Amino acid sequence: METTNLLLPSTRRTRMGMINRTFIEDAVIVSEKEQKKEHPNFIESNTSGITLEELETNCIVPSFGDNQLTISHQTFIHRIEEAASMFFAGETFGNTEIRVSHKILGRHPSALTKRKEELKPEDETIYYQRMAFCFHIRTICREMNGEEVHLCIGGVRSLNEENLYGKKSPEKFKIFIGWRVRVCSNLMLTCDGLTGRLEVMGDMDIYIAALKLFREFNLEQNLRLLENLGRTMISQEQFCQIIGRLRLYQVLPASQMKELPKVILGDSNINAATKGYIDNPNFGLRGRAKISCWDLMQLLNEAAKQSYIDKFLERNQNATDFAVGIQKALKGEDTENYGWFLR
């Protein structure tokens, strides 16, 4: 999706020298030249890849109506990287993967009278309205239900949530930490690994919020919760019942929907999960009579990768919560009415 706006030139915002970096020397960042691409993209729908260098050199930083700069995408990324490098000092980090969407085009004032076909690259300005990024910690890895998983950190920023025509106001970001499956790049986010919508006035607030999130995230407890999903099986009949109920859920009256767990997966996500049940080489049937709740979570998380950037994290967490809820219902421990999806 592309939108064309008339933008005045804006100074690019670079990394601020506010943070003493002496305490992060022990962290190791693996450069792109040293590491080849190892896995699929962590999100697919309507996005394209971009490097940090391209963000810094090719994209302007939009400003508010009072001409105060927004926090740039690259500054957001740098602050999370710095917080991770400090908190996980001594660990080795993989490349930072960046996905963007909704390109916003503009013109420099000197090119206002030019026709579109006359424009040269230097006449145009560009920035991306939505951006997501993540990087994994190569030295914090485990085996979970037969799959290699790494601890992964990242964030999402959507400028469409900001009122750029008004005065500078708190800017909105999302930060996450959680486990990611090596073979397919599926994130497995839980509520304690996601900040929700974080509103900040400056980039140091991002740094502080990231450290708080990392401190409160229990790696091993989270790992055990997810690994336990592999111990509960789902028959083909039960899977079909779940899919049918997920479709029915979307057209229920609001009064009835309030009595059920919240599900924010859409039709396209459910269709993708159904297709994956048949042909996903890692988590589908593969000639088996049953799949596990772990497989169900992966199918739903894989399907959530087809969401737009600004909806992706919430849908991923929702998919994880749903699989955990289904497991509890199957074990007779249901306290949130997930059993409705099995009836």
Task: Tell where the protein language model's regions lie, with residue ranges.
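Feature for intrinsically disordered/low-complexity regulatory segments and propeptides
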Residues: E2-E81, S85-T92, T96-V100, I104
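Intrinsically disordered, low-complexity regions enriched in serine/threonine
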Residues: M1-P40, K116-R343
